[in-house]
């Protein structure tokens, strides 16, 4: 039976990590997978996380199963982070949150819930987007369509093309938006553009699904939620798949959340019971450790202050690396203008490098980036910047 199975293609991002590990060149540089690295090239455990873990080590009394939807305090903290403390939506009990195995788990839970319990057949994602979006929705039996997003020539959001292509989306279609730090372009709508999209989506009858993996990495925790909150103010129904991998550095703990919003508390309770049924048939209930860490930090003023400062430090380091990257490329004699990179948000930059140039970077210089030309700015350090920029200039 198994001998007739053909091998799956390597994952475009995680497969790159395998190649990087196997590369024995000492000066190799990994700008592929989206993890934060500090000035020394390490992915650190945050101080706030260590302190929360110490607290849990001393105070945890059981390893019993969690409920299907996870830790209640985690859900409460997640909703406040997304919609703001004192949000009308929270006060009216219109939101329910399930703790999930990472942001990917949240997307799959949302996809399974929609496929089984609604008339949704199509999900619209931006072109380009995170490659795994298509796999997740297709695996749940949903069709994936693309809407225009990026103006490659001007390195900007092509908002007119975005609106035009979404004119094809029908009432009852799901439209997926990146909450902030669009992956892979790093280009986000302005608040005014978010409000236009929110208004349009109400008029057209789309169900908004927000993929929110980078809250705090663009401008700040509150500022980065502006787009989502513009939608929440106008929409009776929406779904948010959020992740704590990046902003808490909890990559391998798989801490995510799927938040369902409906018109009233009775409707959301009914719908959420079906979301829990989808979870029960998938992984039964979530693991406790990472979510306990997040809930401990977010509900403790002292720990939260440490975490917010650490998040600010990470965001500012990435912004410094963007500036240094652009300056160093110029110093090394790049024959094109890369200043657009400074305006992008989050970990990634859509560099404009071609597949061929990316391949040459890897084979000739040991510099690893995704074939689309997406580079992880958080993988850059003052030490690797000069060789990196020399390699890029050599392949231009």
From Swiss-Prot:
MF GO annotations: identical protein binding; L-aspartate:2-oxoglutarate aminotransferase activity; L-tyrosine-2-oxoglutarate transaminase activity; protein homodimerization activity; pyridoxal phosphate binding
InterPro entries: Aminotransferase_I/II_large, Asp_trans, NHTrfase_class1_PyrdxlP-BS, PyrdxlP-dep_Trfase, PyrdxlP-dep_Trfase_major, PyrdxlP-dep_Trfase_small
Keyword Transferase: yes
Record note on biotechnological use: Has been used to construct a 2,4,6-trinitrotoluene (TNT) biosensor strain.
Cofactor or coenzyme needed: pyridoxal 5'-phosphate
Keywords for the protein's UniProt record, in alphabetical order: Aminotransferase, Cytoplasm, Pyridoxal phosphate, Transferase
Reaction(s) this enzyme catalyzes, per UniProt: L-aspartate + 2-oxoglutarate = oxaloacetate + L-glutamate
Induction field: Transcription is increased specifically in response to 2,4,6-trinitrotoluene (TNT) and its indicator compounds 1,3-DNB, 2,4-DNT, and 2,6-DNT.
Modification sites for N6-(pyridoxal phosphate)lysine: 246
Annotated EC: 2.6.1.1
CDD domains recorded: AAT_like
Effect of residue 65 to F/S: Slight changes in activity
Cellular component annotations (GO), alphabetically ordered: cytoplasm; cytosol
BP term (GO), one: L-phenylalanine biosynthetic process from chorismate via phenylpyruvate
Keyword Amino-acid biosynthesis: no
Effect after changing residue 374 to F/Y: Second-order rate constants are reduced by >5 orders of magnitude
Subcellular location: Cytoplasm
Principal location: cytoplasm
Disulfide bonds: none
Subunit structure: Homodimer.
Family, as annotated: Belongs to the class-I pyridoxal-phosphate-dependent aminotransferase family.
Protein name as it appears in the record: Aspartate aminotransferase
Organism name: Escherichia coli (strain K12)
Record lineage: Bacteria, Pseudomonadati, Pseudomonadota, Gammaproteobacteria, Enterobacterales
């Amino acid at each position: 039976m198994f001998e007739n199975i053909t091998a799956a293609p390597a994952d475009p991002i995680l497969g790159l990590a395998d190649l990087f590990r196997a590369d024995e060149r000492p000066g190799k540089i990994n700008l592929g997978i989206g993890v934060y690295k500090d000035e020394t090239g390490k992915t650190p455990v945050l101080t706030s996380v260590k302190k929360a873990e110490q607290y849990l080590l001393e105070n945890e009394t059981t390893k019993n199963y969690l409920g299907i939807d996870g830790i209640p305090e985690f859900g409460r903290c997640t909703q406040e982070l997304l919609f703001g403390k004192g949000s009308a939506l929270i006060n009216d009990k219109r939101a329910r949150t399930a703790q999930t195995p990472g942001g990917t788990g949240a997307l799959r839970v949302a996809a399974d819930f929609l496929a089984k319990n609604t008339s949704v057949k199509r999900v619209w994602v931006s072109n380009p987007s995170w490659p795994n979006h298509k796999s997740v929705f297709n695996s749940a039996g949903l069709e994936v369509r693309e809407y225009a997003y990026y103006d490659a020539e001007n390195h900007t959001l092509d908002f007119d093309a975005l609106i035009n292509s979404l004119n094809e989306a029908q009432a009852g279609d799901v439209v997926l938006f990146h909450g902030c730090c669009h992956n892979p372009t790093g280009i986000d709508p302005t608040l005014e553009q978010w409000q236009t999209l929110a208004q349009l989506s109400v008029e057209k009858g789309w169900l908004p699904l927000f993929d929110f993996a980078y809250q705090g990495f663009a401008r700040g925790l509150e500022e980065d939620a502006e787009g989502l909150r513009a939608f929440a103010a106008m929409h009776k129904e929406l779904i948010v798949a959020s992740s704590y991998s990046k902003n808490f550095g909890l990559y391998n703990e798989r801490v995510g959340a799927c938040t369902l919003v409906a018109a009233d508390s009775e409707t959301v309770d009914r719908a959420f019971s079906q979301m829990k049924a989808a979870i029960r048939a998938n992984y039964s209930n979530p693991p406790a450790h990472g979510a306990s860490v997040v809930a401990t930090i977010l509900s403790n003023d002292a720990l939260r202050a440490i975490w917010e400062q650490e998040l600010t430090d990470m965001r500012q380091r990435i912004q410094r690396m963007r500036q240094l990257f652009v300056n160093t490329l110029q110093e090394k004699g790049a024959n094109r203008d890369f200043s657009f990179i400074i305006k992008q948000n989050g970990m990634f930059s859509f560099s404009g490098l071609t597949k061929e140039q990316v391949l040459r970077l890897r084979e000739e210089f040991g510099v690893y980036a995704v074939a689309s030309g997406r580079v992880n700015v958080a993988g850059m350090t003052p030490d690797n910047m000069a060789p990196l920029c020399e390699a890029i200039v050599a392949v231009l």
